[in-house]
């Protein structure tokens, strides 16, 4: 369970150097890789990939294949296809993680609005400050929803003249109803990003409400807060197509201390070296899927993605040897 909150870390100072590196052509970039020892049998093919991926997007995927010195020399026998294969693998991992995040995020939205609306018998419960701990944060929520509504009214109709295109539920509410000003809760939650959704949940004033919402997706309130704080970062990386497989996220999911939350079963199933990698994030996503989508094939698809990867890839992710044998995973793989 997460410990007490810490004060925000002070911003690091800016560097003092002047950036004066000139832009390089595709030919020059391919030449640079070749000079560093990367085997490139087809230069035109390499240029084509660099043109459509970008050298500096692909560059981080070269680092695991380098010898480690400041000159960025590649290990003997490393080919352009080795780097490209790692890039494609990471893309597959991002797509798989986004698939799970979508289900988890949708379930969280539904849990929040269902509990609060029915418990208090008010579809506009979120307008009342009595449900929230911090007035400024609540004001921010209302401002977000109000701005979204105003932007929707200022724009053109979703449907226009096309009978096959239906208006969104939010547009229907805004053009059909004049009061209350803001939409009901089940429309409100759809206007929020996952970060705003998490902030709204954390700002609920009653512990009983936070507990009930978390319980609806198989978690305790402190664990939900920790995991969703991590998901905000992970989703941002995925949405911007960033490197995920060996990225240091800076924030990681709390390890549940209760057996009521689905988690790894083996005592050594999550070594210390794995706790600050992407692996516990994958475990946490499957944990929630156990509650909200128990028939999901996500674990099987993850296994298929990881099954044939070299040890370097699994180590970078924090995935321990024999990971799929743990009962947490194996029940989904039989």
Predicted regions and their residues:
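Long, contiguous internal "core" modules enriched in hydrophobic/ aromatic residues
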Residues: 2-334
């Amino acid at each position: 369970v997460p410990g007490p909150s810490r004060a925000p870390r002070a911003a690091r100072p800016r560097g003092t150097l002047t950036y004066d590196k000139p832009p390089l052509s595709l030919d020059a970039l391919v030449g640079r890789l070749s000079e560093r020892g990367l085997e490139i049998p087809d230069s035109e093919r390499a240029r084509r990939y660099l043109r459509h991926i970008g050298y500096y997007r692909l560059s981080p995927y070269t680092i695991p294949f380098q010898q480690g010195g400041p000159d960025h020399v590649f290990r003997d026998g490393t080919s352009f296809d080795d780097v490209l294969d790692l890039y494609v693998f990471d893309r597959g991992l991002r797509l798989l993680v986004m698939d799970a995040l979508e289900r988890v995020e949708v379930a969280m939205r539904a849990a929040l609005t269902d509990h609060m609306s029915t418990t208090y018998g008010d579809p506009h419960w979120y307008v009342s400050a009595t449900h929230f701990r911090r007035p400024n944060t609540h004001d921010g929520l209302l401002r977000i929803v109000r701005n979204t509504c105003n932007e929707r009214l200022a724009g053109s109709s979703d449907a226009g003249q096309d009978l096959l295109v239906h208006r969104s539920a939010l547009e229907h509410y805004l053009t059909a109803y004049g009061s209350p000003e803001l939409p009901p809760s089940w429309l409100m939650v759809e206007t929020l990003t996952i970060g705003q959704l998490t902030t709204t949940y954390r700002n609920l004033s009653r512990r009983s409400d936070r507990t009930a919402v978390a319980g609806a997706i198989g978690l305790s309130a402190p664990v939900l807060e920790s995991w969703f704080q991590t998901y905000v970062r992970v989703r941002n990386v995925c949405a911007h197509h960033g490197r995920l497989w060996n990225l240091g996220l800076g924030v990681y999911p709390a390890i549940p201390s209760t057996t009521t939350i689905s988690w790894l079963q083996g005592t050594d199933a999550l070594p210390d070296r794995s706790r600050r990698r992407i692996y516990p994030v994958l475990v946490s996503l499957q944990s929630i899927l156990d509650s909200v989508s128990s028939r999901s094939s996500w674990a099987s698809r993850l296994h298929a993605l990881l099954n044939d990867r070299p040890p370097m890839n699994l180590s970078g992710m924090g995935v321990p040897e024999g990971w799929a044998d743990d009962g947490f995973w194996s029940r989904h793989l039989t």
